[in-house]
Amino acid sequence: MQKQFDIDTAVKTLHIGACEISMPKIRGAQNNVFISKSGIDGSEYVYKFNSAEMVLKNELVAQMLDARNIPVPRVVAHSAGHQWFEVYPKIPGRTLYECIGDGMTPDDIDGVYADILDLFAQMSKIDWRPIYKMQYSQTHDVVKANVTGVNNKFMGKLYSEAVKLMNRGSNETYGLYHCGITPKNVIIGHDGHIAALVDMDEVAIANKNYAFGMMAAKYQQLRGNINTLIDSYEFVSGQILDKKRIHTISNITNFGKRLMWLMGRRKQIHQR
């Protein structure tokens, strides 16, 4: 992670009056996301630091999803010296993670997932060819980069190869999907509906069953019934999913995330 001085300097090349630059309260494992306030009108912006290739890919996929009326941040790529980052106005609302922590009812959670299924169906219609030749256009490459950054090269390669295996399929099953639809990446607006899906790193070319399995893994952790989720999607989309494969992917994903969390904790302890 960059030093705070470097972060402040980079942010202020774009927003000179930026202040209160800090990490969000709810964040993932990468520790590369920051929020600032404008010293002029108090408006807030989100900055995510990454490689130039990842930032440019994220800017493009955000545009592709937005063109399908899928709510995502208006990502703009920016560079300051050797540092690259994406920036967008902070989305009003709270993460689904926060809402669940504050006692969101199971019925309301199911309502959010019903909206997610509609968005997932829209993703299946996106032409992914414009990003095919870009670096990090494939979901296993995204996994390799992010897991390596959080853990190490060995874990990055291990997870990348596992994703390659789970992500296999025929050409007609591939699409441009958000493969990280978790409660931390879903922003709920004041009306109780989805205001945005965030973390454009996770948007990549993927097999439909793999992407659905990644989303279903978290639903399973919330005590949801994956079969019901699959049946609902097939009803609203008219598409058939591979139930057995999705169950396998969800189970492997939940085991893998637990292992990665333990490895990350071990790394943090050794760095102290």
Task: Give residue spans per PLM region.
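Active-site activation/catalytic loop segments of kinase-like enzymes and analogous catalytic loops
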Residues: 209-239, 251-269
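Short amphipathic alpha-helical segments and helix-helix/interface helices
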Residues: 62-63, 120, 159, 163, ...
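C-terminal subregions of glycosyltransferases and related glycan-biosynthesis enzymes
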Residues: 140-146, 159-161, 220, 242-255
